[in-house]
Amino acid sequence: MSLENKVKNEYGNIAGIVVLKNDSVVYESYFNQCSENEPIHVFSVTKSIISMLFGIAIDKGYIKNLDEKVIDFFPNYKIKKREKTIQHITIKNLLTMTAPYKYKSNPYTKFFSSADWVTSSLDLLGGSGKIGDFRYAPVIGIDILSGILINTTGQSVLEFAQDNLFSPLKISVEKNVYFRNKEEQFDFYKSKGINGWVADPNGTNTAGWGLSLTTMDMAKLGLLYLNKGFLYNRQIVSEKWVSESTQVQSVWETRNLKYGYLWWIIDEKDCSFAALGDGGNAIYVNAKDKIVVAISSLFVPRVKDRVDFIKNDIEPIFKFN
């Protein structure tokens, strides 16, 4: 069965696939009336872009190290009475999903109706949970990282990304995207062609979701990491950060999943890692075989595993070419 037929028969929500081998495009195809120039909301792939921005912020001296306490970046934040945990949570805890939160189930309605998603996240950080235990925070909590970037660089997250990551890679992310109600938010989830990055009412860009990229944009970001942070004759992210952020830093033991700094570690033997988002969005890098696979997808609630698709159906075609 051809790759195109496989997509149409089993992975019907895929918008585009780009495969790079040895820095060259060896496959590029689009589906569902999508085109190469249409950005797609990539959901949690956004997290790995935030990881890149933290590497750049550290390289430029805005942030000293990952052991700095989160609360130190928010001097005006008033810690709740009897709170004894938030004071000890570090940037590294946020990047490795080893920070505790006070909620059991995500309080999305209350969170998204607030004007300041960073403060709302701080209000939910800490509590009685144990620092160091893996707890994946898909949306609520991760925006604290955006607040840290803003408070250290003096720029919005989008501005900092445009200057230091997107522009050097010739990636266009035009504007902040705002929602007036939940209907607009759900419409955005299913949309294609909106060029921007979701922001809260204060203008703070989301850290865990909300970025729109074309499939080729995603491939470029993967290629940047395949090449150890160097692309277009420029060291955009330090080699040290690329290596550190794509090594195992924490483990989601109940699911046997390994995590770096906002990157999923797929296979340590072939040095493969991935940025993964809802709906089946993926940036996959196999450093050993010099392969990058980018898959953009239109949102549906449940999809077949993209890593399995890449490893079983895409990699074997191009591995030895």
Walk through the language-model features, giving the residues of each:
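Active-site-proximal loop and beta-strand segments within enzyme catalytic domains
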Residues: 5, 10, 36-42, 46, ...
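Active-site Gly/Thr loop motif
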Residues: 186-205, 243-292
